[in-house]
Amino acid sequence: CMGCDGRSISVAEGRKYEELLNKKEGTLKCQDDLAGKIWSDRPQMSKEPVYVLNVKYAGETREDKISRVREEMKKAGAQVHVLSSLDDIVWLLNIRGNDIEYNPVVLSYVILTMDQVHFYVQEEAVPDQVREELEKAGAVLHPYFQIYEDVKKLDPSYKVMLEEQCTNYALYKNIPEGTEVIFQPNPAAVFKGNKNPVEMENLKIAHVKDSRAMSRFIYW
């Protein structure tokens, strides 16, 4: 038997370990955070305030982005999309944060259906104004860790789409048995790689500022 914290490995890694262990009649246990039980001075999760990325920088509203992702879900035949890659989440919702140093992301998860956006986040980090904007786009806020229980309640007749390289194994294992899981790249990851005119113009401005700073450094 092999044990690990399923939140710390990807679906792809977990499935690979399962395959190897099955050949040896072994099992993989992934539901316990053993280190957490003895880590008495473990730092608290970051709760930096979430802020909105204005559409003048994003070039596209969150409503339009959500609609585009839902179109990809339809093409794949999925009714549910589980999203856990932080850069894709902040792109989709037009938000930013400071939960990870040097990365403007928010510790969060998203479950996207055809009519709702379930946003799992430390709610005290979401200012009222940001909450209101997200709710206008159909988002429902939930406590960060609640996703692990909510995934268990998914209708097994639904098809669930997720990226196996970015989704953690514990989340995947909580999906009801018998549910069809569609493994494919997150549509948000593909979309955000294709910059719109507003983003391209802002990239030029950013490069000018970066070049100015580098020139000053070289001169110094």
Residue map of PLM features:
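Active-site neighborhoods and metal-handling regions in enzymes and metal-associated proteins
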Residues: 1-220
